Amino acid sequence: MAKKVLAMVKLQVQAGKANPSPPIGPALGQHGVNIMEFCKAFNARTADQEGMVIPVVLTVYQDRSFSFITKTPPASVLILKAAKLAKGSSDPKKIKVGKITKAQVEDIANLKMVDLNAKDMAGASKIIAGTARSMGIEVV
């Protein structure tokens, strides 16, 4: 018989830097999860992606055990990294803060393809380009 699911917890955590302090501690503590066990497992799984923000979906079972799935970094983080920027524009329609090439957009779309709601690379590239435009970054 399958374990009964108690909760699904979604977090965005720096790769390799999970620790029991907020926001991780309170989010997992209220469900009775062993926080240090999660932190060690997460840090081991994401050690090769140092410096990236990694979304994680944690499934907590009724016996207080857990499993988790790591996803690809958010498109906005990948776009900022490609454009070598710290943050996007405060007014994206008027103020453009950087540029990325179509090749960079395609690379990001290829990386994000598993998490995007797109049937092909062209659709995925359009999604990534739209995200870049909404951040005040031009696609050239």
From Swiss-Prot:
Part of the ribosomal stalk of the 50S ribosomal subunit. Interacts with L10 and the large rRNA to form the base of the stalk. L10 forms an elongated spine to which L12 dimers bind in a sequential fashion forming a multimeric L10(L12)X complex. The keyword Signal does not apply. It comes from the Bacteria. Forms part of the ribosomal stalk which helps the ribosome interact with GTP-bound translation factors. One or more lysine residues are methylated. InterPro entries: Ribosomal_uL11, Ribosomal_uL11_bac-typ, Ribosomal_uL11_C, Ribosomal_uL11_C_sf, Ribosomal_uL11_N, Ribosomal_uL11_N_sf. Keywords: Methylation, Ribonucleoprotein, Ribosomal protein, RNA-binding, rRNA-binding. Gene3D superfamilies: Ribosomal protein L11, C-terminal domain, Ribosomal protein L11/L12, N-terminal domain. It comes from Desulfatibacillum aliphaticivorans. Belongs to the universal ribosomal protein uL11 family. Pfam families: Ribosomal_L11, Ribosomal_L11_N. This is Large ribosomal subunit protein uL11. PANTHER family: 60S RIBOSOMAL PROTEIN L12, LARGE RIBOSOMAL SUBUNIT PROTEIN UL11M. GO terms for biological process: translation. The keyword RNA-binding applies. GO terms for molecular function: large ribosomal subunit rRNA binding; structural constituent of ribosome.
